[in-house]
Amino acid sequence: MKRYLTILAAATMLSCGGRQAGYPVAGEDHTVKIASFEEFQSYFRYVPGRDIIISAHRGGMQEGYPENCIASCEKTLSMMPTFFEIDFSFTKDSVMVLMHDLTIDRTTNGKGRVADYTYEELQRFRLVDRDGNVTDYRIPTLAEVLEWGKDKVAFNFDNKYINTKGVGEAERRRALDYYVEQLLPGGAWSEYHNIFLSVRSLDEALYYWNAGVRNAMFCIEISTPEQFRAFERSGIPWSYLIAASRKAMDPAMTEIYEKLHDRGVMVIVSITGSADRVKDRRDRRVEYLRTLLSEPDIIETDYPADFVGLPVGREELRAIRDREAERMERSVCRAAGLPIACRAEIRRAASVRPESRRTPAGSSPRRECTPCRRRCGCVRSNGSSKAAR
């Protein structure tokens, strides 16, 4: 942890020395001007060397700023380029309001199911921030948020009705059909060009696609070769896909990531259930840096403001990673009492796949280091035999 704190400090200085964040489409005010769905697809098309995008889960959360609140979105956008994942629920009178849960218990100073209140009745309650502090903010409607974000930001719609416990089949179908109705020509969402849908399965994406939805992208989990092949056979063009990785850039999936990138598909990882859970802010930022160094294309987080000052540029991140690798190589050489020339051999050994490192029966596991003609990590320069630790 101490080593990563040192790297974090250096990374922050490096980030401050250049640009804060330079996404290709975001302007100086951090907004994204999108005039058509084609431009929206272009914004989410993978381009080598492009900066990592930080996504604000539920609009981003800070002290005094509740989740799924327009004021919270405004605050986050004032600090950095981003886009917003938002959730919504139906009221008793069929108004879509921003609300992650089916009840208002956790996020407001009220109690009860959203579906048991009319929109007007909900307006007497106030949203609370993550620490439980009551704010002055009311529950917004989805229509209000869409209008606020028009020509400004992108939105990721999360349809919680699809797999939420306690939701019946009739409610699920109603939510699916509501999406279709709103997105088809003439629907309330059809005039916007800044929406993609997080779907729980390829079948859900196909439900929208087969119903004629062509003005929204789909965020679908592709964490296995089987899921990759299933999407390839689906008939949905790759230009409509943002790939969600269940694990934060799993090395075992490198080949799949490369195939996705070859098709212009960005990979998003969510850290809301991992790094975001670290209580101490400094330690949390260390975990954020670890995630950045793994180079996903998009990171979804509850606390986007905590990424401010961290490097999101690929060149910056690779420079940090290279310096850390060099430091580790020097450390191994010093521990083994070997000349620094052995670093090249250590780097070569580190790049060999684990299966190729297995030693045939009866042979020595030690290998002569070309630069110094010694056994790397096994023999000190004074000739004494001692394994490097």
Task: Please tell me what each predicted stretch does.
Residues 8-17:
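Hydrophobic h-region of N-terminal signal peptides that target proteins for export
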